Amino acid sequence: MKIHRNRPLLLLVTAFILFSAFRADKPFITIFTIGDSTMGNKKLDGGNPERGWGMMLPGFFSEDIRVDNHAANGRSSKSFITEGRWEKVISQVKKGDYVFIQFGHNDEKTDSARHTDPGTTFDDNLRRFVNETRAKGGIPVLFNSIVRRNFVQPKDASIAKDARQTPGEQELPKEGSVLFDTHGAYLDSPRNVAKEMGVVFIDMNKITHDLVQGLGSVESKKLYMFVEPGKIPAFPKGREDNTHLNIYGARTIAGLTVDAIAGQIPELGKYVRHYDYVVAQDGTGDFFTVQEAINAVPDFRKNVRTTILVRKGTYKEKIIIPESKINISLIGEDGAVLTNDDFANKKNVFGENMELRDRQAATSMLRISMQRTSLLKIRQGR
């Protein structure tokens, strides 16, 4: 787009206020998520790339939806209740909210604090979640477990135990080309309870099985926590983990899941959004900085616009847009601010008298304020 002298700030901010003004007085719909480590939020210390798919959900919904993720590492349907976690969630549920329920990985464990049996105690816990959610006017949705990356037959015991190991710690079993199930009847309980109680059921095991099987034993490692030694401070010795997801895996699976949700719950589906990249300071996106997202845009993508959602926060960055990065849209959440102190007292920081074209200089540097905004398009070329 052309940026004219003395007008860009006014035009941009005016447009953004119009977009965001409709959000102010509308009540949020909250999606509460309960489950285990494959769904949960993760600490970011040391560059930890592990993510639960539920952690990535905010980047797939409009700002009408608030995601409150209570899924926690190591929890089963039983321990989630006995530790008081469920009471904390259900006390906050209001009419029209959703509760996404996914357990199974740890219900399979043998220790008495977590173990439940499919068909009896596991099903009873799921029924409790459903009944108590409905009693508060909420809408329960049942999910079964995501697939473990198990290309070994018979199933390898270490995989079934969700083992995490460092590379070379022990010899791995030879993998084949067929993905084998490790969950057994624990996959059926959510399906059966959903049918019995008239609840929406999302078959996440099938969604993830099809994804992982389609990628194969080698490419599917890109979804999971396979970390080379010496690459990430959080795991100096590396990591080999066939259960837990990395950033790419969690974003990919969350995207497939929201599409399945939209297909079964149109009322929620109207809030679903897909972006090529999400930038978020809290780890709920692909990147922490806007510059990283711009760098990831494919070069000379002329016929397709690349969309980048910038989630709430203040991003102090000097944005450099190479001439090869064209047709980019930055979409800022309400409260997203992109700024750089180096430019604060300089004129022409919005590129006045500049039209960004393919043949322009190699880079263009912009300071962009997205306060109270929700849409910004940066376009190079036509």
Model-derived regions: residue spans:
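Alpha-helical cap/lid subdomain in secreted, periplasmic
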Residues: 2-3, 26, 85-247, 251, ...
